[in-house]
Amino acid sequence: GKLTDSQEDYIRHVWDDVNRKLITAKALERVNLVAEALSSNYH
């Protein structure tokens, strides 16, 4: 079955949203790791 344009747009929108959240989560994870490394150096 072929998707309609509106279905494709919706899927693309959801996919973009998921990707953005994953990228944000990875970035936050990296920031947390750096913060931990820095704080352990100072204590």
Curated annotation (Swiss-Prot):
Its main location: secreted. GO terms for cellular component: extracellular region. Keywords: Antibiotic, Antimicrobial, Fungicide, Immunity, Innate immunity, Secreted. It is found in: Secreted. It comes from the Eukaryota. GO terms for biological process: defense response to bacterium; defense response to fungus; innate immune response; killing of cells of another organism. Expressed in mucus-secreting tissues. Belongs to the globin family. Shows antimicrobial activity against M.luteus (MIC=4 uM) and E.coli (MIC=12 uM), as well as against the yeast C.tropicalis (MIC=4 uM). Shows a pro-inflammatory effect, since the topical application of the protein induces an increase of cellular recruitment characterized by an increase in the number of leukocyte rolling. Does not show hemolytic activity on human erythrocytes (at doses up to 100 uM). Possible monomer. This is Antimicrobial protein PcfHb. It comes from Potamotrygon cf. henlei.
